[in-house]
């Protein structure tokens, strides 16, 4: 008997044949598409459940009215919304679910207590102890914007950020000597590590050069060797086939990455802490009277017909500033994509300035830097703090920032940048 049974079960059945030993499912008593899963609850009243009679006896009453039947009490069940069908209770047992209390953030106090939402939604204030140079520079920036967004808040009563260019007082004898840095020359030996040393590998019958790290085939010809030039004082390496593009001023990306839009550039680590929150630059009327006109290059001076328009406060009526010039729009907080774009511009500018800093005079370098920022500023985006801070501290990516000691000088990692 046992044998025939097993043979019967394991026999290959034809697709149209009914499987005898699998019980037929009752109808789905629980179908809520919003719920994480489907639960199948087999009703206990035969295969096709009859509607429960409303009149007359419903059968024996359960011993535990209002309570779940004994079979559920020892288990913790994730029950569907309408509970489980229980034969003993003649119906559905709906578990009593404790309602989760919604978290209410503390309300705003009239005295100016700030909830976390306020902190997240209000623009950050730049907290830098202003030096005369940084104030002058901030005023230059204010004047220079053709579509001027006005005043940058320099708040003195707030805790200042650590200026990353402050000289650190460190005993000279504890510091190791730093050799004087020479600008890179063409094909400098110091940059040899930048050309990845390729290794011969046999692939099939061919011997090819392979980069030992990334394991990919080199485009370098075995006979001619590496064709690349060091193009600037930072020891940047450009391969020969990319040189025309480099000369045209394109940013040369390495094609090693599948995603082309991802840059190689990494932001420079900074001493001190800058907030990454976007900084909104508010508008102010009196910008052009502040800086002396002689100190500002002529192309930075605001033209008379476009002067900065004060921002409308919330409580002011719109009639106060009736005729806004057509370029005027309040500063928006940027999206992530815009932020990345601005960051790319920033980093590109940073690298260009870095490359130029042995070749041009510091003042021109600084002006170029600020002008480069005006290009971004006119695009009407909110700056993140780490971008605007170097502007306000009156610094540029100049030789001091990149920690290159001067001739016979030993110095710590954070240095003064003279504005």
UniProtKB/Swiss-Prot annotation:
Coiled coil: none annotated. Residues 1-27 have a biased composition (Basic residues). Pfam families: SatRNA_48 (PF17485). InterPro entries: SatRNA_48. Residues 1-66 are annotated as: Disordered. It comes from the Viruses. Belongs to the nepovirus satellite RNA 48 kDa protein family. This is Satellite RNA 48 kDa protein.
């Amino acid at each position: 008997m046992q044998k025939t049974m097993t043979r019967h079960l394991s026999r290959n059945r034809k697709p149209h044949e009914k499987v005898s030993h699998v019980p037929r499912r009752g109808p789905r008593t629980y179908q809520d598409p919003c719920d994480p899963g489907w639960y199948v609850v087999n009703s206990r009243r035969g295969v096709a459940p009859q509607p429960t009679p409303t009149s007359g006896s419903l059968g024996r009453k359960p011993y535990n009215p209002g309570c779940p039947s004994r079979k559920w009490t020892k288990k913790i069940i994730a029950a569907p919304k309408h509970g489980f069908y229980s034969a003993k209770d003649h119906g559905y047992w709906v578990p009593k679910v404790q309602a989760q209390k919604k978290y209410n953030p503390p309300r705003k106090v009239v005295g100016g207590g700030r909830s976390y939402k306020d902190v997240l939604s209000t623009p950050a204030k730049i907290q830098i102890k202003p030096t005369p140079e940084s104030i002058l520079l901030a005023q230059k920036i204010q004047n220079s914007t053709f579509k001027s967004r006005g005043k940058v808040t320099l708040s003195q009563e707030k805790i200042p950020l650590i200026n990353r260019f402050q000289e650190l007082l460190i005993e000279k004898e504890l510091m190791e000597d730093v050799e004087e840095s020479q600008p890179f020359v063409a094909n400098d030996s110091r940059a040899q590590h930048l050309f990845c040393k390729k290794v011969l590998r046999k692939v099939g019958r061919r011997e090819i050069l392979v980069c030992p790290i990334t394991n990919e085939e080199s485009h370098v010809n075995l006979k001619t060797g590496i064709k690349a030039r060091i193009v600037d004082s930072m020891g940047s390496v450009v391969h020969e086939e990319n040189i025309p593009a480099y000369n045209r001023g394109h940013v040369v990306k390495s094609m090693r990455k599948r995603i082309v839009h991802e840059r190689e550039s990494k932001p420079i680590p900074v001493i001190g802490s800058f907030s990454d929150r976007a900084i909104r630059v508010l508008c102010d009327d009196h910008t052009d009277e502040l800086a002396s006109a002689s100190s500002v290059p002529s192309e930075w001076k605001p033209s008379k017909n476009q002067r900065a328009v004060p921002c409308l406060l919330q409580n002011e009526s719109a009639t106060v500033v009736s005729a806004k010039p057509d370029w005027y729009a309040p500063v928006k907080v940027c999206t992530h994509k815009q932020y990345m774009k601005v960051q790319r511009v920033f980093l590109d500018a940073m690298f260009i300035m870095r490359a130029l800093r042995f070749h041009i005079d510091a003042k021109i370098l600084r002006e170029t830097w600020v002008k480069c920022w005006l290009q971004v500023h006119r695009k009407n985006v909110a700056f993140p703090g780490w971008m605007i801070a170097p502007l306000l501290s009156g610094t540029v990516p100049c030789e001091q920032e990149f920690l290159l000691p001067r001739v016979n000088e030993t110095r710590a990692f954070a240095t003064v940048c003279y504005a």
